[in-house]
Amino acid sequence: MAETAPLRVQLIAKTEFLAPPDVPWTTDADGGEALVEFAGRACYQSWSKPNPKTATNAGYLRHIIDVGHFAVLEHASVSFYISGISRSCTHELIRHRHFSYSQLSQRYVPEGDSRVVVPPGLEDDPELREILIAAADASRATYTELLTKLEARFADQPNAVLRRKQARQAARAVLPNATETRIVVSGNYRAWRHFIAMRASEHADVEIRRLAIECLRQLVAVAPAVFADFEVTTLADGSEVATSPLATEV
């Protein structure tokens, strides 16, 4: 019986900032937030912080977002390793073209024991879950049968790696959209804000919405001055959404 895979989002990289020693400026933040402030001040050489309202890093970044100077947000980035996400969800995710992706390859990784991501609409219904798991088991059995026969068909191929790849790339056609995949996603702060605004909305598919909100929670921990304007609320159906009056790039 196919195992189910829960969503897991792991922070694996974030920006480090190294202040140039010859610039007469300090800040009360570090990492990506400091870099964004530095980039903004570099545009105007405002190292002396002449405006009291933007003298702190949080005040400066709030002003940057308020006035729509989003270009400076592109200097800082965050990377996540995401597992427990379905292939159907990553088909939506990779439409965000400002991100960089490295996804599990079904041509190289055998999927005979792959896990299944249960869609949100089926989670609380044992009968529907059972139907889903049965369908996944049937497709995996067909995948395994096809793989065996395809490897035999390509037996004349002397390169064993190529032979297995040719078999897997054909057999994977029968795998369901619910098959778990794993993916590394890297993006700058501006791209992440756009993703959250688009995919944490009540109009988004629930699976990618959950992903967006989990990413948001971790982004707030990394760069609160950049992401804390998003508010997470719960809808009548129990699902969560995140919105911000400052998320103007949608």
Swiss-Prot record:
Q: Identify which cofactors the protein needs according to its UniProt entry.
A: FAD
The record's cofactor note says: Binds 4 FAD per tetramer. Each FAD binding site is formed by three monomers.
The residues covered by the ThyX domain are 7-233
InterPro entries the record matches: Thymidylate_synthase_ThyX (IPR003669), Thymidylate_synthase_ThyX_sf (IPR036098)
Q: Where is this motif: ThyX motif?
A: 95-105
EC numbers: 2.1.1.148
* Enzyme active site: 199 (involved in ionization of n3 of dump, leading to its activation)
Pfam families per record: Thy1 (PF02511)
What keywords sit in the KW lines?
Answer: FAD, Flavoprotein, Methyltransferase, NADP, Nucleotide biosynthesis, Transferase
Write out the residues that bind dUMP.
Answer: 92-95, 103-107, 172, 199
Reaction(s) catalyzed by this protein?
dUMP + (6R)-5,10-methylene-5,6,7,8-tetrahydrofolate + NADPH + H(+) = dTMP + (6S)-5,6,7,8-tetrahydrofolate + NADP(+)
Is Signal set as a keyword in this record?
A: no
Question: Please, which domain of life does this record's source organism belong to?
Answer: Bacteria
- Name which cysteines form disulfide bonds: none
**What SUPFAM superfamilies does this protein map onto?**
Thymidylate synthase-complementing protein Thy1
Which GO biological process annotations does it have?
dTMP biosynthetic process; dTTP biosynthetic process; methylation
- Extract the NCBIfam families matched here: thyX (TIGR02170)
Which protein family is it in?
Answer: Belongs to the thymidylate synthase ThyX family.
Quaternary organization:
Homotetramer.
Function recorded in the entry: Catalyzes the reductive methylation of 2'-deoxyuridine-5'-monophosphate (dUMP) to 2'-deoxythymidine-5'-monophosphate (dTMP) while utilizing 5,10-methylenetetrahydrofolate (mTHF) as the methyl donor, and NADPH and FADH(2) as the reductant.
Would you tell me the protein name for this molecule? Flavin-dependent thymidylate synthase
> Which organism does this record belong to?
Mycobacterium marinum (strain ATCC BAA-535 / M)
